[in-house]
Design a protein with these regions (language model features):
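Bacterial Sec-dependent N-terminal signal peptides
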Residues: 1-22
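Active-site mouth of glycoside hydrolases
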Residues: 27-34, 39-42, 47-243, 248-256
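Short, solvent-exposed loop/turn elements at domain surfaces
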Residues: 41, 50-57, 277-278, 333-334, ...
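Aromatic-rich peripheral "rim/lid" segments of glycoside hydrolase catalytic domains that contact
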Residues: 308-407, 431
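Extracytoplasmic
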Residues: 389-461
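Extracellular glycoside hydrolase catalytic/binding regions
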Residues: 24, 185-330, 335-348
Length: 461
């Protein structure tokens, strides 16, 4: 594993210093500030896949895209009891204290936790609660406190699912969040339970009520607004201090009917993927912010090239908008901070599930899954240093930085070109995805436009 170089810009360092021990975050006009009134620009990372596994993160998207589908695939091979053991080990390894420590050292000052409701309240037992989700959240919050990062709670998978996509763990044929009054009441009750538990926690940065609703809602999103207001009212019965983050419909970006604000400590959160990094791409949100004198937060973005990352962060920070990137770990990834390798046994399961391999024995499957869970541990991951350099150092400077130490005489590899911005450190025609497809055809080693492929040739000259 490559050693980690920590990219904390002067501006990042100042912000981290400013937020230390400064109390609750709050909305103040168009800015987020701490209790001293000092502006805080959130620079965050999302813990995607920890509580809500997604197929593309696990290389199962063609046959098990949602968390429920993934669990069913595993249980069909090793049974429910062993499946429970696997997920416990998976969650134990995927997010550790060391992950949070290193994210803080890289320059992040906040974490977004995508929550699955069923880790807090069982699917088949409405309004009853279990310990697992709360205990995981408590542990994460303790680490965030120690390393002074704000933790933003995000309901990523609401009861029934708030969209018809895998990211909400929606199950076709079952009533969605919008088709069940019980599901909506459960959502309200869960948020009140969370707010009661964390009301006095200064390192909770706020509550992101519902992630990426995607539903054809009537009357200018009235059902979404009504539910948001009901959740807000329930939270305010027990917690009057924390920020309420509000996302629009249609992947968080349609705020029709969601203005004006209904709370004096609210932030509008939009998401940004696969579009140009120009003022026009965020102008509608800026206008909404100015009209209603309310802060904005880019609550989710990423899944692109280093050059796109640099440009996106530069754009939003220039407009006093904090951000949170997606996501921190994936199998076979160059565009997350950590790349997770595949175990041989897990790869055999992928082949079986995709119809290209034979079914492994129960014990072989358990062994492969156990090893895969352990591979998610920070100590076993590869750190993608180039991504972090693009997100922090390159936003502040156009200077180059050596990718590695090169000595002459010696062998120099073209793939080890300097860290730096597009058109300065390197050039490639396809270097970002703005609805035009992939930016890298090799998908190894680095997350720039340069197309590298894995090479096993012996080094001779």
């Amino acid at each position: 594993m490559k050693s980690i170089f920590y990219y904390v810009s002067i501006l990042s360092l100042l912000i981290v210093i400013n937020i230390n021990g400064q109390g609750f975050l709050k909305a103040d006009g168009r800015k987020i500030v701490n209790e001293n009134g000092t502006p805080v620009l959130l620079r965050g990372m999302g813990l995607g896949g920890w509580m809500v596994p997604e197929g593309y993160m696990l290389q199962t998207s063609s046959f098990a895209n949602s968390a429920t589908e993934f669990r069913k695939k595993i249980a069909s091979v090793i049974g429910e009891e062993e499946t429970d053991k696997f997920f416990k080990l998976y969650r134990q390894n995927m997010v550790t204290k060391k992950d949070i420590q290193q994210l803080a050292e890289m320059g992040f000052n906040s974490i977004r936790l995508p929550m699955h409701y069923n880790l807090y309240t069982p699917k088949d037992k409405p309004f009853e609660y279990i310990d697992e989700g709360f205990e995981l959240t408590d542990s994460l919050l303790a680490w965030c406190k120690e390393y002074q990062l704000y933790l933003i709670l995000d309901l990523h998978a609401a009861p029934g699912g708030q969209s018809d996509e895998n990211i909400s763990d929606y199950i076709p044929g079952e009533p969605s969040l919008w088709e069940s009054e019980t599901n909506r009441l459960r959502t309200i009750d869960l948020w009140k339970k969370l707010a009661t538990r964390y009301a006095n926690e200064e390192w909770i940065g706020g509550y992101d009520l519902i992630n990426e609703t995607k539903w054809n809602l009537p009357n200018n999103n009235k059902p979404l607004r009504d539910l948001y207001i009901a959740i807000t009212n329930a939270i305010r019965e027990v917690d009057k201090k924390h920020i309420i983050f509000i996302e629009g419909n249609w992947w968080a970006n349609d705020f029709t009917g969601l203005t004006p604000p209904w709370d004096n400590n609210m932030v509008y959160s939009f998401h940004k993927y696969w579009n140009n990094n120009d003022l026009n791409s965020i102008s509608g949100y800026l206008s909404m912010s100015a009209q209603h004198n309310i802060p904005l937060w880019l609550g989710e973005s990423g899944e692109n090239s280093n050059a796109w990352f640099t440009d996106a962060i530069e754009l939003v920070e220039a407009n006093n908008i904090g951000w949170c990137w997606w996501t921190f770990k994936k199998i076979g990834s160059v565009n997350s901070p950590w790349n997770v390798r595949k175990s041989e046994g897990y790869d055999n399961l992928l082949k079986y599930w995709s119809g290209t391999g034979s079914k492994p024995s129960v014990q072989a499957a358990i062994t492969g899954l156990t090893q895969q869970a352990i591979y998610f541990n920070n100590d076993n991951c590869e750190f993608n240093e180039d991504m972090i350099d693009a997100m922090f150092r390159q936003v502040q400077t156009t200077e180059l930085k050596p990718f590695r130490e090169n000595k002459i005489p010696g062998i120099l590899f073209g793939s080890d070109y300097d860290y730096g911005r597009y058109n300065i450190a390197y050039r490639d025609n396809d270097y970002q995805n703005v609805n035009s497809g992939t930016w890298n055809n090799g998908w190894v080693y680095r997350n720039d436009g340069i197309d590298l492929e894995k090479c096993s040739d012996a080094i001779s000259s």
